[in-house]
Amino acid sequence: MNFEGLDPSLAEYAPTLHPALDPVLDPHLNPSLLQNVELDPEGVPLEGIAVPESVHIVEGMYSELHTAVSEVGVPVSVSHFDLHEEMLWVGNHGGHATSFFGPTLERYSSFQVNSSDDIRQIQSLESGVLFLTKTNLKCMSRGGLIIFDYLMDEAEDMHSLLLTDSSTLLVGGLQNHVIEIDLNTVQETQKYTVEVPGITIMRQSNRFFFCGHTSGKVSLRDLRTFVVEHEFDAYSGSLSDFDVHGNLLVTCGFSSRMNGLACDRFLKVYDLRMMRATTPLQVHIDPFFLRFIPTYTSRLAIISQTGQCQFCEPTGLANPADIFHVNTVGPLIMTFDVSASKQALAFGDSEGCVHLWADSPEVTFNTYSRETDFALPCIVDTLPHLDWNQDLVPLSLIPVPLTSETLLSDWPAANSAPAPRRAPPVDPEILRTMKKVGFIGYAPNPRTKLRNQIPYRLKEADNEFDSFSQVPESPIGREEEPHLYMVAKKYRKVTIKYSKLGLEDFDFKHYNKTLFAGLEPHIPNAYCNCMIQVLYFLEPVRCLVQNHLCQKEFCLGCELGLLFHMLDLSRGDPCQGSNFLRAFRTIPEASALGLILADSDEATGKVNLGRLIQSWNRFILTQLHQETQEQEGPQAYRGAGSSTFGSSGDSVIGQLFSCEVENCSMCRCGKETVRVSSTLLFTLSYPESAEKPVKDYEFAQILKRSICLEQNTQAWCENCEKYQPTVQTRNIRCLPDVLVINCEVNSSKEADFWKTQAEYAFQRALMKRGGFEITKGKEISLGDWKELGNPEVGHSYPSVEELKNIWIPHAIKMRLTKNKELDVCNWSESDELSPNDDPESVYVYDLMATVVHILDSRTGGSLVGHIKVGETYHQRKEGVTHQQWYLFNDFLIEPVDKCEAVQFDMSWKVPAILYYARRNLNSKYNLVIKNPIEASVLLAEASLARKQRKCHATFIPLMLSEMPQAGDLVGLDAEFVTLNEEEAELRSDGTKSTIKPSQMSVARITCVRGQGPNEGVPFIDDYISTQEQVVDYLTQYSGIKPGDLDAKISSKHLTTLKSTYLKLRFLIDVGVKFVGHGLQKDFRVINLMVPKDQVIDTVYLFHIPRKRMISLRFLAWYFLDLKIQGETHDSIEDARTALQLYRKYLELSQGGSEPDDFRKVLKALYEKGRKLDWKVPEPDSQSSPKHGAVFPPVLAL
């Protein structure tokens, strides 16, 4: 350890501290010292440095082994042997650090730590290296990357650090305190006051911390409290160095003589058992550094600044014969260190050189060192020679250049055939010795090949939907995962990257440039996000569910309406369907159908999402049909207005989707049975012909045979009184307004059918655009292709990409004849009905949505939707009148071309659901939304808890005369419990990455009056009953205890989440302003979208940009002289405190005479918080800075 305060080469230190050393020896002040010295900055000694080429080392004796240069002419300030790897670290006065590997001192890394200050101490860790400068502690990797950078006050002057354990560090200097830093959080955890300032050296034993002071004293401090236990006054001048071993403490330093300092040649030795000085040790050199080198004996290495080195026993006499001299380039030794193995010594001099001494040529710095990572060597640009005639030479010897163009290997497998190499000729020796028996020949092994040498073939992976090979345009990563790079980036599964700030610094605008709202995917069973968006953009469905409200706690119609309301309010910010999915998980039918997924199944991709979303589509339509068909009156919610849709018992879902069908069963005995039913969707049925090639079908043909289905099956015949082969046919009696089609592509057979039909449609489209006669089954010749692209022939070249993989039309025409026969044909968006067509019996359907399954083996696949957004929604959301197709991939929303919505590359993009809506659908329905939530939701209601009593009530409900108006203030606070712990992983560099955040559920919501005679009195204090398992009640922070949310044993006012949610929705709709602390998180967990002008968040009112957020507890203590949140949190207390803070904010911001007065108040707040480490002091330690509450106490309950 170097006491740098005595080195005259440092200009900022007073030279009077060490007058014995002449300042002319400083190379900074006297450049003539460097005139005859010439050094290579890479560490190779040149002329002028006398370094022996071969060193003879006697075993057991230290001799110079190697010398290297850190930086020419810049004095070395500190050296340190790495405690984990075979490296020596050197820092200099220019703030530059260099590491050398092994006993040969090969330069490993070199980088700048500080641009202005010198490096004063180095400490190696497992994950990096700590560098201490005057006002800065920096941790860097061994390669030079910054891990963290801890800045201290400019008034600090740090000199020493001590690693007390793997994660705690003490830092001291010339000031009167020592700082304790937690290396895990990189935060100051404690500050110890020092009676005698100027700690420049620190050591540690199993009993004490040892601190060396500039005054010449050594203090022994308690390991836990840092309190001084003993103190030794070693020297009258100053302390230079000391070391501790066992029960001995040895010091060297300077004594005051004739108004100056002189180096004392007596080493002071102290016995730590008796805590007193023993016989001092006299040496023959001026000691400046000393270290114990305990091997067989407790030897001391004593170094002078002029380069003399003496070894002696601390209890014996120093022998002049044991003095050695370091061959320094500069005149002064600036630093000294001993390796952990005690086999190597390191000296740094004033000319930037480091000298390694060792007791053997094969020296190791540590007893057990881990392997050091080296940089990969540079790849030589010359390409290897490849002999084409050699069969076993791999072609991969020559790397393929990176290119974005299509390679020859990208040619589709359907247009090429494998051409294997010809078999190698048979060895002539085998032919010469071969004997034949009939047509079989055999010969002895000539032993010219290695054993078991066979051609290696890669295992071919079969993909269910991949009948021909495709590879991406770029060759990067082809072998690793080709399917990943086939999927366009916008179709890949999107994930939220969580940081320390959660979602605050995640840029959702990067994924969504529109004003439409996406949906977050991290919630369990959020695979249905794309279908929620499809239903939302069906205007009649959206208006229906937003007008619907009933008394059922878990009603999907109600929750869907509340979610749609948030999507209406959002201006591009994503929403989350947590409440809807919470209700969805409670429905028994959903669980019975296998629609509730476990987290493991959803994450690993074990579920066929295409089949799952089709089942979910059938379930949600049926569920909405049942829920909206229920009678009003007893089932209507007490705060709901009347619906604008239809009469009692009528379902708009039935009007939109329901189709009455007639099922006829004909037994071979001649008995016919007819049964009438209704269906909400149809499933495509594909022909089961085994003919090759597959016939050419239009989509309308397949759709007709799927609707009017005919099949042979075994059924019970009442006439025959047994199961008989029966022909079952299905016919429809009416057409729906919205035609929903499940594509049912669940195997390679259906995928091949789609692919083949798309190829037929591709050829028809090309011939139609090129003016050729369309003939089914005719292939286009090469000459026809050339004519299609030849402008002289008169044909316009069609966009091939727009025609690929398209089979389904953008519109279809359906007609029901008088005989109830169905006609279906493909139609065009631009085509209109002829005058002869009856609008009542002829329907034109336009494609409005497609849901596709994205196949991706790495992420488990995902579901996305293409939705055609109409003029009505565009006008309301963006103020424009047009139609546009959009891709909805959770929170990624992007406009796409209409052709892309119907293009299905079956190798990665598989169709799942199609929605066709009748043209001019919106004109048939009343699309007026009447808010069904009325003021009666705020009136008193009964508690679900059986043990709750009126005397325990913590709130007074609003009276009709107190109903809030627009602009009224309401104090709000919410408490939460944890349903699922967060999922995180530790990366190889030690950092923590959050994969999935913890799932929170609201447990208590409190609203207090913000004005009037009862200001501060709560009118809502609801505990939310939950049926889900709670893993952590967070009692310390929420005040919620086990049993508070259980209706059987709770004594609280317990309600359902839906009931309290409707109260908050009513307050939002009225226009009240919510005042609270951290409301952004509260509204997010409650799943509410609140306009920004209705939110007053005190966490932002008292905040300076780019500074930390301040807790409610500290703000209440500082401004209001209130002590809150003692043992637990109370939401009533927090809501009241937030209101008082807002009043205080208005007083400070509007009452000041200068506009900068409030900013001065905030600066004073942050300064006070920094001094107190943002902890509210105890009552007996420090009084609050303010006195008196902002307004009188609120009415007690």
UniProtKB/Swiss-Prot annotation:
Designated name of the protein: PAN2-PAN3 deadenylation complex catalytic subunit PAN2
WD repeats: 153-193, 195-231, 244-280, 328-367
A Pfam entry, by short name: PAN2_N
Binding site for a divalent metal cation: 973, 975, 1082, 1134
USP domain boundaries: 486-919
Keyword Membrane found: no
Record note on quaternary structure: Forms a heterotrimer with an asymmetric homodimer of the regulatory subunit PAN3 to form the poly(A)-nuclease (PAN) deadenylation complex.
Organism: Gallus gallus (Chicken)
Compartments (UniProt record): Cytoplasm, P-body; Nucleus
Superkingdom of origin organism: Eukaryota
One of the protein's GO biological processes: mRNA processing
Region Disordered, residue ranges: 1176-1197
Main location: cytoplasm
InterPro entries: Exonuclease_RNaseT/DNA_pol3, PAN2, PAN2-PAN3_catalytic_subunit, PAN2_N, PAN2_UCH_dom, Papain-like_cys_pep_sf, RNaseH-like_sf, RNaseH_sf
Domain topic, free-text comment: Contains a pseudo-UCH domain. This ubiquitin C-terminal hydrolase (UCH)-like or ubiquitin specific protease (USP)-like domain is predicted to be catalytically inactive because it lacks the active site catalytic triad characteristic of thiol proteases, with residues at the equivalent structural positions that are incompatible with catalysis, and it cannot bind ubiquitin. It functions as a structural scaffold for intra- and intermolecular interactions in the complex.
Mechanisms controlling activity: Positively regulated by the regulatory subunit PAN3.
Top EC class of this enzyme: hydrolase
Cofactor: a divalent metal cation
Cofactor binding comment, as recorded: Binds 2 metal cations per subunit in the catalytic exonuclease domain.
Signal sequence, start to end: none
GO MF annotation terms: 3'-5'-RNA exonuclease activity; metal ion binding; nucleic acid binding; poly(A)-specific ribonuclease activity
Family statement: Belongs to the peptidase C19 family. PAN2 subfamily.
GO cellular component: nucleus; P-body; PAN complex
Region (Linker): 368-485
Gene (name only): PAN2
Domain Exonuclease as annotated: residue spans: 970-1142
Keywords: Cytoplasm, Exonuclease, Hydrolase, Metal-binding, mRNA processing, Nuclease, Nucleus, Repeat, WD repeat
Reactions catalysed, as given in the entry: Exonucleolytic cleavage of poly(A) to 5'-AMP
